[in-house]
Curated annotation (Swiss-Prot):
Underlying gene: glgA
Family: Belongs to the glycosyltransferase 1 family. Bacterial/plant glycogen synthase subfamily.
Organism: Protochlamydia amoebophila (strain UWE25)
Function noted in UniProt: Synthesizes alpha-1,4-glucan chains using ADP-glucose.
Name of the protein: Glycogen synthase
Keyword list, A-Z: Glycogen biosynthesis, Glycosyltransferase, Transferase
Keyword Transferase recorded: yes
Database matches in InterPro entries: Glyco_trans_1, GS/SS, Starch_synth_cat_dom
Pathway per the UniProt entry: Glycan biosynthesis; glycogen biosynthesis
Pfam families: Glyco_transf_5 (PF08323), Glycos_transf_1 (PF00534)
One GO BP annotation of this record: glycogen biosynthetic process
Amino-acid positions noted as binding ADP-alpha-D-glucose in the UniProt annotation, renumbered to this chain: K15
Enzyme Commission number(s): 2.4.1.21
């Protein structure tokens, strides 16, 4: 099949969150399985261009309509991780993607409306006829109504549209007249059955448009797909998702084991694998390798070399991620004879300031270290050198960090929500087979909830080493590669392609 993904992010060159990793991982797996896969993203001035090979101009002066005028664009083509990627560079006086950032501009909505119209115009003008156009999140959701109501009428009819929702919190709400910028009649779409926002009827909801107009809709875990049908997690779109439940499914994200793998990880000072894991108490070879990385991590972050577990946390510092719980656990972990490492940053100035104050408070603390900027090397060291990994999210569509932690033999402590509930089975769960248990789970998003899970984990680490070793083994054995997830997508691609 020929599949084109249109997205706002792509790892490793334009990454803000998990969306970038998902687009790369899924596309690589589809390509490895013999499918023709292309990707279209904006040509950001701040992306890591060194990750692009053989970048050349593919379409010079592509015209695209915006706000009553036609503007030229240059479309570049290059190769990223052996995938063909098209980069759209607008020649618009507002320099939509020359801002030194991926998101966070006041006119983000207009930037991605422009990108969406231009991406579709490129496919149409070049007569590129894929079987599937796969859209991601609100930034490209408007392509679905654009395609169905404009480009199909121009004779561009072959592709089917699949739309993936990565996070219901971000929906792309705008005024009806904003759709006029890209040639759609905004007033026409301000109807409940089209794109009218369910909570604020004077607004248009781009995410809703993606749901209504796509041939199929997915989200990033089976449990999150159930949760978003409820008012709590549906964020106002639960009724729309219930209405279109016949074309809606949750597919768990995978991770790329060619990158996240302690056996071959280029960032680690030593390597270890499941095959080398100890079979009994006397066999300490691999534990010693993980312990060696733990020692290096402590030295790098000036933590005390004591018989204590390290609890790691790698996250964006936004309310969704349970930042109040993270702040609370710092002291609790130390009181329970643990050490805590945080790697994260926040796009929200008040939260960023708050954590910088905490960092100052814990300067030179022998058991606490906060890193408030991204470091890929440190991320890998923390996954490998930690004993436990906390993910206290208030909601979590899928979550990748807990899956990565499992591969590194680092036991997750998570809240039971979204994809965390799909991937982590509590060690004390009575209805699960012993080899399926791989972590600690709590329900209530409060201090008592997370404290109880941390206490159980730390107690096991100190008092039940054989049980702890088995938890590590169980996690490392689990397969969350893209192989199975990509097969689920392929079945949907094939099913919707077969429909007239």
């Amino acid at each position: 099949m020929h599949i084109i993904h249109i997205a706002s992010e792509l790892a490793p060159l334009a990454k803000v969150g998990g969306l970038a990793d998902v687009v790369l991982g899924l596309c690589r797996e589809l390509s490895w399985k013999g499918h023709d896969v292309d990707i279209i993203i904006p040509k950001y001035d701040c992306m890591d261009s060194e990750q692009i090979r053989d970048l050349t101009v593919d379409y010079f002066e592509l015209p695209s309509f915006y706000n009553g005028e036609w503007f030229f664009n240059t479309v570049w083509m290059g190769w990223v991780e052996n995938l063909k990627v098209y980069f759209i560079e607008p020649h618009h006086p507002r320099f939509f993607f020359n801002r030194g950032c991926f998101y966070g501009c006041e006119d983000d909505l207009e930037r991605f409306l422009y990108f969406s119209r231009t991406a579709l115009e490129f496919l149409y003008k070049k007569s590129i006829l894929p079987d599937i156009i796969h859209l991601h999140d609100w930034q490209t959701a408007v392509i679905a109504p654009l395609y169905k109501d404009m480009y199909q009428k121009l004779g561009y009819t072959k592709p089917k549209i699949l739309f993936t929702i990565h996070n219901m919190e971000y929906q792309g709400k705008c005024a009806a007249h904003d759709l006029n910028y890209i040639g759609l009649d905004g007033n026409r779409y301000q109807q409940h059955s089209f794109m009218q926002d369910n909570l604020y009827p004077h607004l248009i909801n781009l995410l809703k448009g993606g749901i209504v107009y796509s041939d199929f809709v997915t989200t990033v875990s089976p449990n999150y797909a159930k949760e978003v049908l409820t008012p709590k997690e549906g964020r106002g779109l639960e009724a729309t998702l219930v209405e279109y439940q016949h074309k809606f499914k949750g597919i768990l994200n995978g991770i790329d084991y060619s990158y996240w793998n302690p056996e071959i990880d280029r960032f680690l000072p030593a390597h270890y694998s499941l095959r080398e894991m100890p079979k009994n108490k006397k066999d300490r070879n691999t534990v010693d390798k993980k312990g060696f990385i733990k020692k290096i991590l402590r030295e790098k972050l000036y933590l005390a070399e004591e018989h204590r577990p390290i609890i790691g946390c790698i996250t964006r510092l936004v309310p969704q991620k349970g930042i109040d719980l993270i702040k609370h656990t710092i002291r609790h972990i130390v009181e329970k004879k643990g050490q805590f490492i945080l790697l994260g940053s926040s796009p929200i100035p008040s939260i960023n300031d708050e954590f910088h104050r905490l960092k100052h408070q814990y300067t030179d603390h022998p058991h606490i270290h906060l890193i408030l900027h991204h470091s890929e090397e440190l991320a890998h060291l923390i996954y490998a050198g930690s004993d436990m990994f906390i993910v206290p999210s208030l909601f979590e569509p899928c979550g990748l960090t807990q899956i990565i932690a499992l591969k590194y033999g680092t036991v997750p402590i998570v809240r039971r929500t979204g994809g965390l509930a799909d991937t982590i089975i509590d060690v004390d769960h009575t209805d699960q087979q012993p080899d399926k248990k791989n972590g600690y789970v709590f329900d209530d998003p409060d201090a008592n909830g997370i404290d109880s899970a941390i206490d159980r984990a730390i107690h096991c680490w100190f008092e039940e080493p054989e049980k702890w070793r088995q938890l590590m083994l169980n996690g490392m054995k689990m397969d969350f590669s893209w192989n199975q997830s990509s097969d689920c997508y392929l079945k949907i691609y094939q099913a919707i392609s077969a429909k007239n």
